[in-house]
């Protein structure tokens, strides 16, 4: 027999490539339009809100199929947490002309979720400050957003999805405020970062991150996100172009806080204090972590409702890949898991 914290074979899902998703989760052809935020064409109801973290204004985005109506069943809430180099909309509501559906907000709104995301301090439409927007700052951002989401939706617990440093933000928030987290998806996550090629390369700039609160984020840097792991064929070049076209309207500087944290302060999350059900999802070519590092974290999670999924032919940016439909399928299966029967 195995203990609750041991790694059972049934817990580790190596997702095969064919036939995983169809219908709403399939990649559909899109009409040619200018790149930027996903065009809704009246299909969705959207809203924006502002949270305050002291003097810092934080922009929050919401999308669902229809406007909220009195007496309707309360929809499940999915909150998406962005990473180090892109703000919320280019991460989760991107339109790539003629290339199919890339907007997670669209995908999950169609699946019946009330979908939310936010720009962290120093990103997108949120306040630019003298700070470096590190992981701890991101947790405070989420704490500021949660009361607004609860008030507008009637729910006090939400599903969270975070990718890359967004996964660290989401996990750290789940550790700090477990009563607000229903199910948690950690995508392209990093625990201790041991033997991770991307972090080894990034650490060469550690002194810069220690002495500067912003870093250059130009078109070449954005493109490198999709090529640095040695599998550029996993991505359509139009994705990097669409992200750059959208993001560079906010300038060429990004906060250094998450880079500093990931190169000098890991681990930032204690897995034994993450109490919610957890899905850990990664691409098989992702250089931000290793299987050994992530399985170390996974094996310490106290909740037996957990999954570890590796997607083939995917590098760091899972939900921007050609195989993103596989990720959407796995995420939906996890979020819609029926309640367990107590024994």
Residue positions per predicted region:
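N-terminal cap/lid segment of alpha/beta-hydrolase-fold proteins
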Residues: 36-70
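Short glycine-enriched nucleophile-adjacent loop
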Residues: 167-178
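Conserved acidic catalytic loop of the alpha/beta-hydrolase fold
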Residues: 140-156
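Short, surface-exposed "cap/lid" segments of acyl-processing enzymes
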Residues: 69-74, 78-110
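Conserved alpha/beta-hydrolase "acid-adjacent" motif
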Residues: 287-293
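Alpha/beta-hydrolase
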Residues: 199-281
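Catalytic histidine-centered segment of alpha/beta-hydrolase-like enzymes
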Residues: 314-324
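N-terminal secretory signal peptides and thylakoid transit peptides that target proteins
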Residues: 2-19
């Amino acid at each position: 027999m195995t203990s609750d914290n041991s790694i059972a074979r049934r817990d580790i899902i190596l997702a095969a490539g064919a036939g995983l998703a169809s219908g709403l989760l399939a990649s559909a052809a899109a009409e040619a339009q200018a790149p930027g935020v996903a065009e809704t064409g009246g299909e969705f109801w959207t809203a924006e809100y502002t949270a305050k973290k002291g003097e810092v204004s934080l922009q929050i985005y919401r999308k669902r199929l229809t406007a909220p109506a009195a007496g309707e069943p309360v929809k499940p809430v999915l909150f998406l947490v962005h990473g180090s180099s892109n703000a919320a909309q280019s991460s989760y509501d991107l339109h790539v002309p003629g290339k199919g559906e890339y907007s997670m907000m669209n995908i999950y709104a169609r699946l019946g979720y009330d979908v939310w995301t936010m720009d962290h301090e120093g990103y997108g439409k949120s306040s630019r400050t003298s700070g470096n927007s590190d992981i701890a700052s991101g947790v405070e951002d989420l704490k500021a957003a949660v009361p607004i989401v609860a008030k507008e939706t009637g729910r006090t617990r939400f599903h969270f999805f975070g990718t890359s440093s967004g996964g660290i933000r989401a996990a750290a928030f789940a550790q700090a405020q477990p009563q607000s987290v229903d199910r948690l998806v950690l995508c392209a996550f990093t625990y201790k970062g041991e033997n991770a090629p991307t972090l080894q390369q990034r650490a060469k700039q550690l002194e810069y991150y220690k002495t500067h609160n912003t870093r250059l984020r130009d078109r070449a840097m954005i493109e490198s996100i999709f090529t640095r792991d040695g599998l550029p064929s996993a991505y359509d070049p139009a994705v990097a172009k669409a992200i750059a076209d959208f993001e560079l309207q906010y300038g060429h500087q990004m906060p250094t806080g998450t880079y500093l944290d990931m190169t000098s302060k890991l681990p930032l999350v204690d897995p034994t204090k993450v109490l919610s059900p957890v899905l850990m999802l990664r691409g098989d070519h992702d250089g931000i972590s290793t299987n050994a590092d992530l399985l170390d974290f996974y094996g310490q999670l106290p909740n037996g409702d957990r999954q570890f999924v590796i997607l083939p032919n995917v590098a760091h940016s899972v939900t921007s890949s050609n195989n993103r439909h596989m990720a959407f399928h796995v995420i939906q299966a996890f979020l819609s898991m029926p309640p367990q029967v107590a024994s």
